[in-house]
């Protein structure tokens, strides 16, 4: 009997098969403040690879979508393994890669000898919970942005993803991850009630974790998202082979960072975490 892949909620299964969502994804996220913020962080953490490097560095892009992160990384000289469960999304990415290759061939640019060459992008259709086909130590770094980790249903499944990534990334490599904050619900209408319901349900149902929610999203009535507490995220990463270096608190609008928790600054809408493979 057919079953959905592990960690994939019903709404997520619908999402990854919607071609219109993939076709209009770039326009949808174009003005998303968090995309600008995470791009700035990536530029600092993964600034680029020069041609003088002995070999290219490989970045694992988890939930790569249409290449919003993969293409800028490749432009800085990184090779990228782009993993997504959505075939329509990967189709858009492949089209962009082919266009970029044609541009590189027909419009060569004069660059310094130590400037980075455009890296290779390797799209793979896969469930993030099931990455056993990727070899140990295949990547130097990894990114998991735009709340992709929260789209995975079940804490054990999310930990499985983190463990896979720790296995694939070489020791000393970096992970940059973005998630939504569970307690941001307190700033929303009815948020206290929804958090209470989620907590009670997490006690009575083995299929529900505190912070799980479904919501209407781009024509889908039950899109799944798990929202993390800071403690939960740090605990899970630490238990799965990662040393947490920095936890950055995003404003509710995701357009700026807040101060440290003890220094005030309001409730965070989400977190961007930088971690190192132990």
Please place each PLM-identified region on the residue numbering:
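Conserved class I S-adenosyl-L-methionine
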Residues: 1-54, 68, 268
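A short glycine-rich, Lys/Arg-flanked "PGG" loop and its adjoining helix->strand segment in the class I
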Residues: 159-171
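Class I SAM-dependent methyltransferase SAM/SAH-binding core
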Residues: 67-101, 114-130
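A short SAM/SAH-binding and catalytic strip from SAM-dependent methyltransferases
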Residues: 141-156
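A short acidic, Gly/Pro-enriched loop at the edge of an enzyme's catalytic core
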Residues: 133-142
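Core SAM-dependent methyltransferase catalytic element
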Residues: 259-278
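Class I SAM-dependent methyltransferase "Motif I" SAM/SAH-binding loop
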Residues: 63-65
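SAM-dependent methyltransferase
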Residues: 176-237, 246-254
